[in-house]
Amino acid sequence: LDRFHQLAEARAEDDVEELTSRLIVTDVHDFEEQAEAVRDTSEFAERADLVVLDSVTGFYRLERVGDGDHGESLRRVARQVTHLLSLARKHDLAVVVTNQVFTDPDSDRARPLGGHTLTHWSGAVVRIERFRGGNRRATLEKHQAKPAGDSARFKIVGDGLESVEDSP
């Protein structure tokens, strides 16, 4: 919430406390709590404009270490994502889900944790890369109406995002 306060104070015309009162933040500590929080979104979805799940695969990564059946952990993630997708369609709700990546030892490339499951269920996929100096690049990898490959470079600053030149 500290970052939210910083952005709201710098950008918002509304009172920061009034804006904060419209947020619902749930801090979860394990996969079960995450699943419960996702289920609980049904209770307020019709009044919400946006739901953010950051990161959908954080606990999946921990679960699959001790899970002999990696598929069950991934199915649990997929159920959470499909529940949010269902609410998004029913209530015209924006849903943002972040994912973690890992370096594939065979190709030495970053791959999404959980494979293609999240990509399959997502309407849009944006890859964000970090460069020296705090610069970042957001690249559109999947979208229902736009071609993949469009990108924008930016830097996170005190009052939001700032566009940067094309060199990383």
Task: Specify the residue positions occupied by each region the protein language model found.
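Conserved inter-motif catalytic segment of the P-loop NTP-binding fold
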Residues: L1-G68
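Small-side-chain structural scaffolding
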Residues: A37, T41, A48, S55-T57, ...
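Conserved P-loop NTPase nucleotide-binding/switch module
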Residues: L53-H83, L93, Q100-V101
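Phosphate-binding/switch region of NTP-binding enzymes
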Residues: S86-P168
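Amphipathic alpha-helical transducer elements in NTP-driven molecular machines
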Residues: E17, F31, A35-V38, G71-T82, ...
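Short, low-complexity, polar/charged sequence segments that are solvent-exposed and flexible
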Residues: A10-E13, E43-E46, E72, Q144-A148, ...
